[in-house]
């Protein structure tokens, strides 16, 4: 059993190393994105925080689920990451279904979409950017509706 905060320390280290040298569309160090996603979650749940920090690691770096497991990342975190990671050849519909299948993944994806919809992150805003933002907002609302359905 890990002490409180230990998995979060590991997740931050893994994410920082994995995203080293990567930059977002606005030219900012990429690690700021997962940190912001974690902040948007406004949760004290350490595993949810880890999911936010690691949500792009498998998709965008050479890190594998095996690496994460060996580092002591919990199965709950890894299961959510499997739903949050776009697979090669996966359609948008299939990806959404994967996210909808995991409550944790839905919360992290909402925070991710919220940060991805922040136009202040871009250097200049094109029609293509606005189209992408609209797509993100639709997905955000779909997730919110699903979470509300599950409550009733």
Where are these predicted regions, by residue range?
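Active-site helical microenvironments for divalent-metal-assisted chemistry
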Residues: 1-152
């Amino acid at each position: 059993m890990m002490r409180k905060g230990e998995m979060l320390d590991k997740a931050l280290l893994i994410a920082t190393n994995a995203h080293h040298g990567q930059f977002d569309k606005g030219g900012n160090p990429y690690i700021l994105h997962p940190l912001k996603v974690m902040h948007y979650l406004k949760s004290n749940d350490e595993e949810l925080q880890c999911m936010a920090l690691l949500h792009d690691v498998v998709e965008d770096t050479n890190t594998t689920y095996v690496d994460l497991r060996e580092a002591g990342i919990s199965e709950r975190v890894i299961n959510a990451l499997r739903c949050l990671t776009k697979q090669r050849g996966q359609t948008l519909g299939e990806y959404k279904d994967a996210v909808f299948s995991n409550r944790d993944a839905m919360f992290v994806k909402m925070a991710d979409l919220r940060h991805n919809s922040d136009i202040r992150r871009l250097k200049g805003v094109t029609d293509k950017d606005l189209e992408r933002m609209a797509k993100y907002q639709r997905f955000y609302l779909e997730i919110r509706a699903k979470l509300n359905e599950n409550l009733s």
